A protein has these predicted regions:
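Active-site acidic/histidine clusters and adjacent loop/turn architecture
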Residues: 1-130, 267-309
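Alpha-helix initiation/capping motif
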Residues: 54, 160, 166-170, 238, ...
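Generic alpha-helix signal with a bias toward terminal, lower-confidence helices
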Residues: 63, 92-93, 146, 153-158, ...
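A contiguous catalytic/ligand-binding core that recognizes phosphate-bearing ligands
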Residues: 105-210
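Short secondary-structure junctions and interdomain/linker hinges
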Residues: 134-141, 200, 233-237, 252-259, ...
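Short, Lys/Arg-enriched charge-dense amphipathic segments
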Residues: 160-171, 260-270, 281-290
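Residue-level signal for alpha-helical context at structural boundaries
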Residues: 166, 244, 263, 305-308
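An amphipathic alpha-helical core segment
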Residues: 185-282
Length: 309
């Protein structure tokens, strides 16, 4: 069980909660408004439609394990929370009298680490394995985002249409780019969306079973998935770390789509023309920056997970 590190009184933790709600709302609120109006955004919606954390859950603040919140009896009923004991409150720095008062009224709560580990131990172990394996891999910066192009390959034959996006080079131009480039995609959840004619071109043939051993730290989608691994461990993981992972995923998604074969100028996105040497260089520059951020986030997540396993 994690050591109780600190206590936050009502005004303190509510300030943190408001800050988090504003930070998360900057991304979630426009998505919710678009959804209510029947609108879609080809870049920004992805993190709320592909991933499973709902906007309301996304905006809900959690302190993470080892923090006791005062004046919040309602959280006792939240999943993986429990009331703090009198001894825990004293250990965390409250006077015996104050500890007794809060324990009696049940308004001091914290994350129930033993219950989480008991119920979600498999998720913890898997997350540690996939993050650790990815961290140990050498980054490969030679894919140039070709996975998105492979998903649009032979679009005419496959009758693939994007209602509000055109292919920047047209169907034939897109096919030529795919056919003239090396494709080396290690991420199964990208590879599974390749067009049938493009799948055999991939030098790697990732599967769900090999996912935990094939991810590598330059992959945009592996780096986006750090957000997924983080939110699956809520409330054990604090919301600030989850948001840092989300913002990495947000930036990776933008790079992914700027380098994709679609024309997004009308949406305000300048293309990164990865079919050219200049575009490849720009893509790798941004990819390296994201990879460096991912290294730090994996380390933070692994440090937290290792506390409980």
């Amino acid at each position: 069980m994690a050591e109780v590190l600190k206590v936050l009184d009502g005004p303190q933790w509510r300030t943190y909660a408001r800050v988090h709600e504003r930070r998360a709302g900057r991304f979630a609120d426009p998505f919710v408004r678009r959804r209510e109006q029947g609108q879609a955004h080809p870049v920004e919606d992805f993190l709320f439609t592909y991933y499973t954390l709902k906007p309301g859950q996304f905006k809900r603040w959690h302190p993470g394990a080892g923090v006791i919140l005062l004046d919040t009896a309602e959280r006792v009923s939240w999943k993986f929370y429990r009331a703090a004991t009198e001894d825990e409150l004293v250990l965390a720095g409250l006077s015996p009298d104050d500890a007794h008062t809060h324990a009696e009224c049940g308004d001091a709560v914290l994350v129930d680490v033993p219950q989480f580990v008991d119920k979600r131990g498999t998720a913890l172990t898997f997350t540690r394995e996939i993050l650790g394996n990815t961290a140990d891999k050498k980054a490969f910066f030679g894919c140039f985002g070709m996975h998105e192009w492979a998903m649009a390959y032979k679009s005419v034959q496959n009758n693939i249409r994007h209602d509000y996006l055109d292919l920047r080079l047209g169907a034939e131009g897109t096919d030529r780019v795919v056919e003239s480039h090396r494709i080396r995609c290690s991420h199964f959840d990208a590879f599974r969306f390749f067009m049938p004619q493009a799948a055999p071109m991939n030098e790697l043939q990732p599967t769900r079973e090999t996912q935990r051993t094939m991810e590598q730290p330059a992959c945009l989608h592996a780096n986006m998935d750090i957000y997924k691994w983080a939110y699956k461990l809520i409330p054990l993981i604090d919301s600030a770390l989850v948001m840092d992972c989300f913002e990495l995923a947000w930036d990776a998604r933008e790079l992914d789509m700027r380098a994709a074969p679609y024309d997004l100028l009308d949406w305000g996105y300048e293309p990164i023309k990865v079919e050219t040497p200049e575009g490849k260089a720009k893509y790798v520059q941004h990819q390296r920056e994201l990879s460096e951020r991912s290294v730090a986030l994996r380390r933070r997540l692994l440090t937290t997970i290792n506390t409980f396993l």
